[in-house]
């Protein structure tokens, strides 16, 4: 898995928290319906006074929706953004809440990018209806980071950008060779939206040569992108319990919030 069940997202740097929103807003658990009729659960954190930038659709790691991502959605509210975290496994595990013993991998291996993108579309529509948002980005972690990258290949989703934290680029690095497992490096030439990608420099699952090849493909296709690797940081460094990586996490928050501002201004280079 990416994070332990008791992991917590790092706090947003204090100077990026909007004082009037510092108390945040509790996320609401909703059930949405995907295009194929699947019911799936999301956690919606609605900002009472948004800054006007894109709404954030959060794509979790291999465990699907759990407390880390609910908390993360609530964090975005304090910076002025609506955020909604989705669960992937409505088709195979139902919409009930799950405990820490949930055996997620059989469900991961049955989850296709097409299904995830259908759920993203439903999440986008729910955000538009509930909040009035008109622009959207995906933000994913690990498995969700790879799904976020691939969402950037689908112009029908109407995304303004995609963001990935240590999204695995070549799943064979982890011995995952399923044709349905997301492999952004093989699809990089099809990405059409701006990309922000953040990696741990000590992550054996995403070696420098994969990152370089991914960036080269984006550059070749003229896709605006920002890619950064944190020296010495592991996979899943974005965790409040990793004191030794607190600076990397704070910098990652700043890069994400700066990127959202650029997306709003149409200024991603």
What name fits each language-model region?
Residues 1-269:
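N-terminal cap/leader regions of alpha/beta-hydrolase-fold enzymes
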